[in-house]
Amino acid sequence: MSETLTPRSLSRRRFVQSSGALLFAAQCPVGLSRKAYAGGTGAMMNSFVRIDPSNVITMLANNSEFGNGAYTVMSMMLAEELDVDYRSIALEAAPTTPEYYSPLFREYLTAGSVTTGSTFMPMRTAGAKARAMLLEAASKDWNVPAFELTTGDATVTH
């Protein structure tokens, strides 16, 4: 049995109306909970950065990626402070709990082309704090002052 499909016209207004539900659905990670999040291994440097014993850096992203470049720009901001290549950062959806809400919308939401602006300081701060923690840990381990240490290419050096 065959059926001939005929194209239908779809107005821009109708497209926007019908795609709204899809965009909303893209914002709501299904089944993500604190329990699922706790499955990661490694040290949580802060709310957004986890570094595993194998040196895998994972960023917990509190914005959705749906072709808007959110994950790329957030990785770049974090990598800039950590002195690593942004492409080496693994991504994981952050839990949908208040500490990960957008500072702009005060809920778990990605909208209005504001990811870069709303995550600039949180990502840069998270990266800078994680870097400072790494330098402090190396300083204690190597018994040298932290100000003598540098970072670059995902490495702490003295």
Question: Residue spans of the language-model regions?
Answer:
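N-terminal secretory signal peptides
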Residues: 1-10
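Short, acidic, Ser/Thr-enriched surface-loop or helix-capping motifs
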Residues: 52
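Short, small/polar residue-rich loop motifs at catalytic or cofactor-binding pockets
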Residues: 43-45
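N-terminal export leaders
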Residues: 10-29
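Short, surface-exposed loop/turn segments at secondary-structure boundaries that line and modulate
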Residues: 3, 56-77, 87-128, 132, ...
